[in-house]
Design a protein with these regions (language model features):
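Solvent-exposed, acidic/flexible segments
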Residues: 29, 42, 49-56, 115-122, ...
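Bacterial N-terminal signal peptides
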Residues: 1-10
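A ubiquitous short alpha-helical element
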Residues: 18-23, 220-227, 287-294
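Bacterial Sec signal peptide processing site at the extreme N-terminus
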Residues: 9-34
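Pan-zinc metallopeptidase signature
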Residues: 229-344
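Acidic/histidine-rich, surface-exposed loop or edge segments in extracytoplasmic proteins
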Residues: 30-47, 103-111, 285-287, 304
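Sec-exported extracytoplasmic/periplasmic mature domains
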Residues: 44-45, 58-68, 175-179, 196-208, ...
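Acidic/His-rich structured neighborhood in mature extracellular/periplasmic domains
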Residues: 58-225, 237
């Protein structure tokens, strides 16, 4: 997730109330932090917290020194908070297409999400959009990049994360801090998703080894995530075909319900996909809609394209990959250039 802090502190007059409230929360959660170094030197710091902070330091160092990501003061401070995530984010799509509802922000351009520190505020925005006929999703976000506006801290709820999850999160957000393209939310998230996951696996191999439980668990977790994304991609393609027809909007909505119901039945039947972990149990209960599918598409649709570039043109080096992304970004549409380059 990127730039949420800037969303809270930039905008037009119609957003003043939103900006003032969310900006105050941003300051609350980014101040009153403790330097990691002083906590490590403090003998009263618990062993659990100490080990966690050392792990975060190691991940951050790896991201900077080995992956070539930006060296800044993110994740050098710690914040104790009594919640299990940071913000609730609203996204919406047209009910009969994958046209995303966009919010306009100075500096960042048009983005398909809006964040809130209090769930009732997010639910209110979601209700407003549902009344307008949009498919809506409200999701929990555990971290975001403020692109240098503040020093992004580590939060106490992250202590429960697996090594892969915390490494992927930190590297994902540091990727945003390293390269951000205005108005290109899909590319920004796809790039950060790819670098975050690939970088996390590299760090795990170096730190724990490929035969370790930490690495094997990460492989299983990623295999399940890839399978889940492939299932959603297949569903999205079926719905896209429905939306491309010349039938009426009402007929499209009816057919959409049929396609989603059929998809859910397939998740629970004899031919149900086999997942390695319990993370994706009870998928048939998912509240699937265009906003949900669009969310996953934004983060993953062109990850295979970026992976192919990473392997073929960067020799499997994230450092070279990031350098190439910066060079392509300076010349225009990154993904168009990647596709063209791979076709040669």
């Amino acid at each position: 997730m990127l730039a949420m802090g800037l969303l809270f502190v930039s905008g037009c007059a119609s957003q003043v109330g939103y900006l003032a409230k969310q900006g105050s929360y941003l300051l609350r959660y980014s101040t009153g932090t403790r330097p990691v170094q002083s906590m490590l030197a403090d003998t009263s710091t618990s062993a659990e917290t100490r080990n966690f902070l050392l792990k975060v330091q190691d991940i951050k160092s790896y991201a900077v020194q080995r992956l070539g990501l930006k060296n800044n003061e993110n994740y050098t401070r710690y914040k104790e908070i009594e919640r299990d995530h940071l913000v609730d984010v609203v996204q919406a799509c047209d009910a009969a297409s994958f046209d995303a509802y966009m919010w306009n922000y100075p500096f960042l351009g048009r983005l398909p999400y809006k964040g809130f520190y209090e769930r009732p505020d997010a639910d209110g925005e979601a209700a407003r959009l549902r009344l307008l006929g949009y498919d809506v999703i409200v999701r929990q976000v555990d971290a975001f990049s403020t692109l240098g506006f503040t020093k992004d801290p580590i939060y106490s709820f992250m202590k429960s994360y697996s090594p892969f999850r915390i490494a992927s999160l930190i590297i994902h957000e540091q990727t945003h801090a390293t390269l951000f393209l205005k108005g290109q939310s899909d590319f920004n998230e796809e790039m950060a998703t790819f670098v975050g996951d690939e970088g996390a696996f590299e760090w795990l191999r170096q730190t724990y080894g490929e035969d370790s439980p930490e690495y094997r668990d990460a492989v299983d977790s990623q295999a399940d995530a890839d399978l889940f994304v492939s299932l959603l991609h297949g569903l999205s393609e079926k719905l896209r075909a429905v939306y491309a027809t010349s039938i009426t909007r009402e007929e499209k909505l009816a057919r959409k319900t049929e396609v989603i119901d059929e998809f859910k039945r397939g998740l629970a039947g004899e031919g149900a996909p086999h997942f390695r972990t319990a993370t994706y149990g009870h998928l048939e209960k998912l509240q699937l809609n265009n906003a949900y599918l669009s969310l996953y598409g934004m983060y993953t649709d062109d990850v295979p394209l970026l992976r192919e570039w990473f392997v073929q043109r960067c020799g499997g080096s994230i450092r070279l990959f990031m350098e190439s992304m910066k060079q392509l970004a300076a010349r225009g549409d990154v993904k168009a250039q990647v596709r063209s380059g791979l076709e040669r």
